């Protein structure tokens, strides 16, 4: 099988040296992502496209899906590469490929040609289109808005029969821009802002301020791992967790009620800037949107920015909530955000929307900054790829089984789309489907006399969810890894 990768248009208008660098980086990213599916896979770069050739036909859908999620790709063409002799040979091959697809439909033919030939692209379009129209009685030519567009590419003595076109996410290849550190909470805003910077070519690391214990951190880990695995797995990234409960306690004790929200955000920026400096990261990313909450007015945002020289990027600054939720739905983080445990460690009864710098600084003089330094020093930093291994250690009390007993039921916790694409069928045991994002609200409705064996394809999500359910008091859960 063969795929032709078309570049994001902004790459094609770069200077020659920059364009070549971007293409080289994108080629490496594609190799890094796809090597998990087929080790014999070949990735070949050209000036205006990248070829992906693979032998394992069983991995076709997985490879195609992975390509649509790699930043830098505008669209993917799934093609059949065959030799041809003349224009009539092109027609015959097109007829064999498209006959069933064109029956009862309107169509047009579009041809791209490279190399020296005795015919032009328009001549091929007319010849092939006329032939298809004659040989398929129920088909009809329609040059504008047809039901089916027959795409053909002619390159020297090769014909590319385009079997399908699939849109990519566009943007720049990860690694073409510098690293950023996303302040992730697991909600709608921070997950979307992280995605937007990945799509723009940045390697996104994650910094999480834990205000609510292990369950909260587990939820945020799931979101960060999902974003990385889905859009950024070509690169290694860090997940840094900072226990911010001591900082919150100090703020509650020492800071005036109305100033708490701004002071908390300033402390988070200070801490994140220290982490960024430690790892050579150039900018912070937040999901703040103008006017969404009291701390996100222009006055307050300016005061928050003042505590650090590190650049703070806010890709959602002009977005409304509905737009952000729609983007979260598109990238697959909406369900995470809706079920994320929320912890409001600092709740002001009358938060200021126009903080005064002198007042904020006066309140912060009462704060013991050694507490902030200590929590940053003790921050837990892991390679995001190790989240699965670390989770396995943390859920050592949750048994992992490869078989099942008479009272066991397998619980498939994959997303609905994954379940539809690859339904799980195991002989000798019942299989129940309940997507991971519904476990927190729906698991209690299941038959608690049964032992539930949580299963997902890679085992990461099942272990995380098993730990979460254990913390909620459910002892009848195990992890199923056949």
Swiss-Prot record:
SMART domains: THUMP. HAMAP family: ThiI. It catalyses: [ThiI sulfur-carrier protein]-S-sulfanyl-L-cysteine + a uridine in tRNA + 2 reduced [2Fe-2S]-[ferredoxin] + ATP + H(+) = [ThiI sulfur-carrier protein]-L-cysteine + a 4-thiouridine in tRNA + 2 oxidized [2Fe-2S]-[ferredoxin] + AMP + diphosphate; [ThiS sulfur-carrier protein]-C-terminal Gly-Gly-AMP + S-sulfanyl-L-cysteinyl-[cysteine desulfurase] + AH2 = [ThiS sulfur-carrier protein]-C-terminal-Gly-aminoethanethioate + L-cysteinyl-[cysteine desulfurase] + A + AMP + 2 H(+). Residues 404-482 form the Rhodanese domain. Disulfide bonds join 344-456. Its EC number is 2.8.1.4. The lineage of its organism: Bacteria, Pseudomonadati, Pseudomonadota, Gammaproteobacteria, Enterobacterales. Pathway: Cofactor biosynthesis; thiamine diphosphate biosynthesis. It is an enzyme of class 2 (transferase). Belongs to the ThiI family. One of its GO terms (biological process) is thiazole biosynthetic process. Residues 61-165 form the THUMP domain. The active site is at 456 (cysteine persulfide intermediate). The keyword Zinc does not apply. ATP binds at residues 183-184, 265, 287, 296. Catalyzes the ATP-dependent transfer of a sulfur to tRNA to produce 4-thiouridine in position 8 of tRNAs, which functions as a near-UV photosensor. Also catalyzes the transfer of sulfur to the sulfur carrier protein ThiS, forming ThiS-thiocarboxylate. This is a step in the synthesis of thiazole, in the thiamine biosynthesis pathway. The sulfur is donated as persulfide by IscS. It comes from the Bacteria. CDD domains: PPase_ThiI, RHOD, THUMP_ThiI. One of its GO terms (cellular component) is cytosol. Its main location: cytoplasm. This is tRNA sulfurtransferase. Gene3D superfamilies: 3.30.2130.30, HUPs, Rhodanese-like domain. It comes from Salmonella typhi. It is found in: Cytoplasm.
């Amino acid at each position: 099988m063969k795929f032709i990768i078309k570049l994001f248009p902004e790459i094609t208008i770069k200077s020659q040296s920059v364009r070549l660098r971007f293409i080289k980086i994108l080629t490496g990213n594609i190799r890094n992502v796809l090597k998990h599916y087929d080790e014999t896979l070949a990735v070949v770069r050209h000036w205006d496209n990248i070829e992906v050739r693979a032998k394992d036909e069983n991995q076709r859908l997985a490879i195609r899906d992975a390509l649509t999620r790699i930043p830098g790709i505008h669209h993917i063409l799934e093609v059949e590469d065959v030799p041809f002799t003349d224009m009539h040979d092109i027609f015959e091959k097109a007829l064999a490929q498209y006959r069933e697809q064109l029956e009862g439909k309107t169509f047009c033919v579009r041809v791209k040609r490279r190399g020296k030939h005795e015919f032009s692209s328009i001549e091929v379009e007319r010849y092939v289109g006329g032939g298809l129209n004659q040989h398929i009685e129920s088909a009809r030519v329609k040059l504008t808005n047809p039901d089916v567009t027959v795409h053909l590419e002619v390159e020297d003595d090769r014909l590319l029969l385009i079997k399908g076109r699939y849109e990519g996410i566009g943007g720049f290849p990860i690694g073409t821009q510098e690293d950023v550190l996303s302040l992730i909470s697991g909600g709608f805003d921070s997950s979307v802002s992280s995605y937007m910077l990945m799509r723009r070519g940045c390697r996104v690391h994650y910094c999480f301020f834990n205000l609510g214990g292990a369950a909260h951190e587990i939820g945020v880990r799931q979101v960060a791992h999902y974003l990385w695995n889905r859009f950024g797995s070509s690169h290694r990234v860090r997940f840094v967790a900072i226990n911010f409960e001591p900082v919150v306690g100090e703020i509650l004790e020492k800071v005036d009620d109305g100033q708490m929200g701004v002071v908390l955000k300033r402390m988070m920026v200070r801490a994140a800037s220290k982490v960024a400096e430690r790892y050579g990261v150039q900018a912070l990313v937040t999901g703040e949107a103008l006017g969404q909450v009291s701390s996100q007015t222009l006055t307050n945002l300016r005061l928050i920015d003042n505590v650090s020289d590190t650049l703070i990027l806010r890709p959602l600054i002009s977005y409304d909530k509905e737009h952000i939720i729609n983007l979260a739905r598109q990238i697959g983080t909406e369900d995470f955000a809706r079920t994320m445990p929320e912890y409001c460690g600092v709740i002001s009864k009358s938060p200021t929307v126009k903080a005064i710098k002198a007042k904020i600084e006066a309140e912060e003089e009462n704060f013991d900054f050694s507490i902030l330094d200590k929590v940053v020093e003790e921050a837990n930093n892991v390679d995001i790829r190790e989240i699965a291994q670390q989770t396995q250690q943390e859920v050592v009390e949750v048994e992992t089984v490869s078989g099942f007993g008479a009272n066991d039921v397998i619980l498939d916790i994959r997303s609905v789309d994954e379940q539809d694409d690859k339904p799980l069928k195991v002989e000798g045991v019942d299989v129940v489907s309940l997507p991971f994002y519904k476990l927190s609200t729906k698991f209690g409705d299941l038959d608690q006399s049964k032992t539930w064996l949580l299963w997902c394809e890679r085992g990461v999500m099942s272990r995380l969810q098993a730990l979460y359910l254990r913390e909620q008091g459910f002892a009848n859960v195990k992890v199923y890894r056949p």
